[in-house]
Amino acid sequence: MPVTPVAKNGITYALFVCGRPEVKDAKFFTSNDEEFQVGVFERGAGYEVKPHQHPENRHEVIQTTEFLYFEKGSASVTVFDDDWNELHKQTVKAGDFLVFFRGGHTLTMLEATRLIEVKQGPFKGEGTTKVFRKS
């Protein structure tokens, strides 16, 4: 199961990309209308990405999207909808990446783990960026 979208009622909450999915040239795993685009490129030696810039493109960020890449270790990941109903649970390991678009999530490290997180800014300060589930 290399690519697992987690969706409910046609809305994507998360995307798990595990292992090394087969890619020819370039493959984006996100839809064009998502606020955050994630793809994998495989290019041969000598392939050149021509010098370029990305023009200013202002848009409103409705909800923060998180991208996590697991460099080492493993974790159990649970994805929730907006009402904290569990949608999906999966173990991820080194080399896997996932994207959280909306809803909630939790991670439990199963061993010493190193991961890289990427998300939109600006950072508005502690206490403003997360809503925790009430116990």
Residue positions per predicted region:
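A short, N-terminal "cap"/entry segment at the start of jelly-roll beta-barrel domains
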Residues: 1-42, 135
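Double-stranded beta-helix
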Residues: 6, 106-135
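Conserved hydrophobic/aromatic beta-strand scaffold that supports enzyme active sites
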Residues: 40-42, 51, 67, 89, ...
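Short, conserved beta-strand element in jelly-roll/cupin
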Residues: 40-44, 60-77
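A short, compositionally biased micro-patch
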Residues: 44, 70, 93, 100-101, ...
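Short beta-strand His + acidic residue motifs that chelate non-heme Fe in jelly-roll/DSBH
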Residues: 51, 77-78, 98-100, 104-110, ...
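Compact, glycine-rich, soluble single-domain proteins
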Residues: 55-58
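Short acidic-glycine-tyrosine-enriched beta hairpin
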Residues: 81-102
